[in-house]
């Protein structure tokens, strides 16, 4: 599944001989390195202090009981801080800096550009009427997942009580936060409203269900009474938010289009991509065509073998009901063993565990398939959460070969390789340990999704599925999905394609149900620039692999390449590529140690 058209190589660096005694690329200990690290830390922790919901997503639990008060004045404060950080960054001397220091400066600049454009150009806070209630609920859900379990990892009863007090405190402040944030929604968008209303409809299921059930057994009667009061007030505020959306959404215009020039600027300045939207669409069309071709080959083989595509050629139907969660855990264990026995990449002994859970209803409208929440950046908790939405009927999902509902062993293995081992869970767990603060805090979707997508076909080639055909078919299905996404994304963002046309195109090219296609296209429209990460990231990774093999010659191995690749953080390939190639003179153990991997 290689991309087969010529684009200029995105690496530009002096040739480095593998046999040379190249100096390590570990960041220098001079004033430049120190200044960059200090600035990165200041940006991260100051922003988290100003935005407690962001702090929670990072695992900075000291802010878990707090909420900001959204306002235009707060936005002006944020913008002033960003401009100040940009001045500080520009003042750091780079003329004699190491490659790592220069790259860290590029990464910080890209981060600040993204922050600034969010306030001055994108202005999502003006468009999304459901964001206030949804964002609070998302944060409470993260806190719920991170609740200390007394006796585990040294957690005490006092730790658990404190965590619950923070949940109650945040819930109590939520109605005020929601009201203040709603006042900033001066240009609500139709699609934002439609999708947002669907998300808000699922909030009571979580707040009044799983969260309340946990509170009943874990807090004192006095705290439970306070919890119920705060919960009910939050549910009422969110219900009011939903009613307002439902009453007016039909009259709101579509306002998710950003324009092609702005989209290309995002790729260049924020994602550090050497491609325009036109380049991305060419890649995507190639990927889509290749997915259809592979599917045709597999169908032909199945016809000749008189073996139907599906569970009979995919390791058997997965069990339904409560047994499904345990089945997923067994498949992740199988993947972990396969990665080790096939020497795919170094699996660190310190790696945490994956907990398989059902996707909350309030997240399902924009996340109908599987997803992974890797361990939070600064949390002591090393558990990753693998979200699945169990099919209403595995048998019915199998009949329609539903790409979003993993119904047999091999499909669960394929998705598990992407989401967990060696995909997002393992890669994210390694990245958060990086000693360079700039690298530790990187969150490049292009790198993360490129690595996970690359692994899907890799496992087919390495023989994980033996002679079974369904995994090959499924891999081709998802190559089509990634290609279709990367076509729809720039077309929607530029305004060249409207929502209805995009849904029709997407449904035809992916085989998704109409409802799943609507959800997928809505997510693409409202979060431009993300879904191209799979296509572009895999392309850049494979191009880097080709350069690595050329440099290393007979000494090249996939194990060495993969382990080196995961030693630079969740960082754009424009940064990782040159650094990895320049580091080839260093022993693998040295590179891995420099990343605290």
What is the role of each PLM region?
Residues 1-4:
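Positively charged n-region of N-terminal signal peptides that target proteins for export
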Residues 6-17:
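Bacterial N-terminal signal peptides
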Residues 16-24:
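Low-complexity, intrinsically disordered segments with a bias for serine/threonine
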Residues 23-597:
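N-terminal maturation segment of proteins
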């Amino acid at each position: 599944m290689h991309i087969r058209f010529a684009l200029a190589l995105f690496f530009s660096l002096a040739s480095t001989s593998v046999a040379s005694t190249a100096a390590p690329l570990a960041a220098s200990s001079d004033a430049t390195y120190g200044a960059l690290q200090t600035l990165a830390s200041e940006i991260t922790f100051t922003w988290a202090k100003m935005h407690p919901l962001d702090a929670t997503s990072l695992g900075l639990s000291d802010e878990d009981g707090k909420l900001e008060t959204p306002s235009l004045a707060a936005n002006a404060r944020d913008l002033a801080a960003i401009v100040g950080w940009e001045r500080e960054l520009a003042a750091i001397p780079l003329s004699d800096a190491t490659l790592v220091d220069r790259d860290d400066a590029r990464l910080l600049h890209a981060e600040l550009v993204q922050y600034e454009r969010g306030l001055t150009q994108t202005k999502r806070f003006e468009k999304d009427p459901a964001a206030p209630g949804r964002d609070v609920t998302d944060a409470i859900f993260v806190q719920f997942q991170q609740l200390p379990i007394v006796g585990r990892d040294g957690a005490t009863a006092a730790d658990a009580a404190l965590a619950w007090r923070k949940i109650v405190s945040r819930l109590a402040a939520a109605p005020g936060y929601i009201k203040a944030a709603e006042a900033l929604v001066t240009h609500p968008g139709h699609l934002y409203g439609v999708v947002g209303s669907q998300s808000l409809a699922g909030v009571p299921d979580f707040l009044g269900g799983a969260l309340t059930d946990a509170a009943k057994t874990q807090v004192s009667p006095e705290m439970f009474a306070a919890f119920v009061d705060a919960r009910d007030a939050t549910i009422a505020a969110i219900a009011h938010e939903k009613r307002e959306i439902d009453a007016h959404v039909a009259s709101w215009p579509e306002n998710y289009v950003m324009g092609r020039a702005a989209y290309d600027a995002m790729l260049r300045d924020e994602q550090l991509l050497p491609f325009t939207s036109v380049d991305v669409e060419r890649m995507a069309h190639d990927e889509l065509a290749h997915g259809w071709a592979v599917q045709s080959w597999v169908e032909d083989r199945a016809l000749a073998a008189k073996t139907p595509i599906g569970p009979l050629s995919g390791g058997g139907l997965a069990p339904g009901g409560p047994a499904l969660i345990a089945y997923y855990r067994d498949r992740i264990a199988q993947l972990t063993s396969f990665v080790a026995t096939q020497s795919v990449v170094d699996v660190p002994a310190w790696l945490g565990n994956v907990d398989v859970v059902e996707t909350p209803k309030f997240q399902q409208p924009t996340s109908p398939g599987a997803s992974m929440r890797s361990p939070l950046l600064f949390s002591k908790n090393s558990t990753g959460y693998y979200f699945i939405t169990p099919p209403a009927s595995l048998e019915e999902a199998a009949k329609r070969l539903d790409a979003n509902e993993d119904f047999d062993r091999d499909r669960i293995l394929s998705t598990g390789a992407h989401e967990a081992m060696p995909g997002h869970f393992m890669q994210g767990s390694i990245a958060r340990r990086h000693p360079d603060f700039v690298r530790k805090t990187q969150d490049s979707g292009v790198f993360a999704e490129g690595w996970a997508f690359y692994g899907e076909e890799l496992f087919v080639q390495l023989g994980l599925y033996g002679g079974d055909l369904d995994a090959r078919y499924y891999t081709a299905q998802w190559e089509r999905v990634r290609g279709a996404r990367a076509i729809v994304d720039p077309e929607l963002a530029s305004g060249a394609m409207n929502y209805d046309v995009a849904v029709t195109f997407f449904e035809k090219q992916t085989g998704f149900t109409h409802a799943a296609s609507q959800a997928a296209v809505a997510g693409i429209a409202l979060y431009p620039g993300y879904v191209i990460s799979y296509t572009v990231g895999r392309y850049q990774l494979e191009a880097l692999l080709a350069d690595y093999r050329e440099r290393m010659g007979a000494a090249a191995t996939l194990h060495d390449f993969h382990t080196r690749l995961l030693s630079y953080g969740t960082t754009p390939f424009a940064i990782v590529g040159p650094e990895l190639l320049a580091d080839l003179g260093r022993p693998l153990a040295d590179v891995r140690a420099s990343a605290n991997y």
